[in-house]
Amino acid sequence: MAKIKVDLEREIGTLDRRVFGGFIEHLGRCIYGGIFDEGSGLSDEHGYRQDVLDALRPLRMPVLRWPGGNFVSGYHWTDGIGPRDERPGRNNLAWRSEESNRFGTDEFIEYCRTLGTEPYICVNMGTGTMDEAAAWVEYCNGTGDTTPRSPTCGASRRLSEGGSLLRQRVGRG
């Protein structure tokens, strides 16, 4: 039989506290009806559920990862920017449901700011392209003086719609 002995006196390295972050995905009621529920008496003017924020704040998550999991492999971020009422609905390929795209990039970044955590965005490595991923990084982190890979999706678009510098970490799938 194998045994494991934990020696609390022997330090072999440190862990980056970001490994203790959180994760949200468009699965079941995690987003819609979970953290985001427009028109609910439990939500603020942005649609963020206050009871959920109150439960999450004490966790002091260093990062929050989105759109995460299987969902991101079919998610195209440009569907989730611009005026909410003009965003296209799509089939959620991972979970076989309808995705309204009412909770998108700007809502996620604002949610993280409200929660006091660092946003961590996962790019689509399934049905997406490297250019799409680069354009998303430029949209979030660009200053408006960069040359976007897609002229309709760069920082200049975010800034023209009144958005501020978003700044986020990016990871793949």
Residue ranges and their predicted role:
Residues 1-173:
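Non-catalytic accessory regions flanking glycosidase/transglycosidase catalytic cores in CAZymes
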